Every structure is written in C-alpha cells, then in structure tokens.
Amino acid sequence: VGPYRVFRRLLITLLATASLAAIPLATTSQAASAGSTTPRLAAYLWAYHHTAGHPYCWGGTGPGCYDCSGVVMAAYAQEGIHFGRSTTDMLDSGRLIRETEGQARRGDLAFYGTGHVEFFVRPGHTFGALETGTLLGWHQWNAWWHPTMFFRVRGAG
C-alpha cells in the first residue's frame, strides 16, 4: 500500500471520527422519553450508537465490521424489520417507499445508485460505511459523491 493510500485512509478516518462529534443527536432514551421514537429513528440511533467507529469490511454484517448494507440490515433487524442482505435485495423487497430528498427524514435510506446505501441524517449528510479501510461514520455529500435515491422503509414510521 503506497503512502498516498495510507494517508488518504487516515484522513478519511480522522474526518469521519471528528465529524461524529458535530452531529446533535438524541440518545435512544431521550428520544423514547420524548415519545418521538419510530422504528426508523430507532434503527438509525442503534446504528449510530453501536457501529460508529467500526471498520468497513466487504460483506460484513457485524458485530466487528460492517459493509454498507450490513449496517442497515443489522439496525433495522433490531426493530424486527427484514428486507434482505444486499442493496439490490433491499430495493427489490417491496418494503421501500420512494421519496424525494426534501421528504427524507433521519433514518430513511439514501442510495447511491443501486450499489451503495447509507442512513439519511439530514440534507447533505449520511451515516454509514464507505469502503475498505474506512470507519463507519457520518459523511458529507459532495459534487461527485451524493445519493441518487431516497426511500422510507414501509412500516418504519
């Protein structure tokens, strides 16, 4: 592995880790006491509290490492919602309701084409796993890397 790739991985990891502290989030207990927890929000909060900082690994479903669909699958499974293992399984499951970016809410799914999925956090930001050598965390979109489709999970609020 060349020095540029090592530096790039380190930089991505540092930025992802540092940016996690900048997200104002309610804890699961705070959201529950406020009476606002939907399965969608609970799945996102589970992913954030249990997987942030874990490494990405291709095909990973936890608990030590996850890939993009593995973390989404594991988080929604905590809420009793199952819709397949891969991004294409999720898209073909019949459980997803298409929505616009403006309709997306925290915990909805943001797809980058058909090959990558993350949790929608707020406009311009997602939570998930990017690629081997990075950690699960919060990501800011940019001109060349941004979701192309947004979905609410049927039955998740």
Segment roles from a protein language model:
Residues D67, N142-A143:
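Short acidic-hydrophobic sequence patches enriched in Asp/Glu that either
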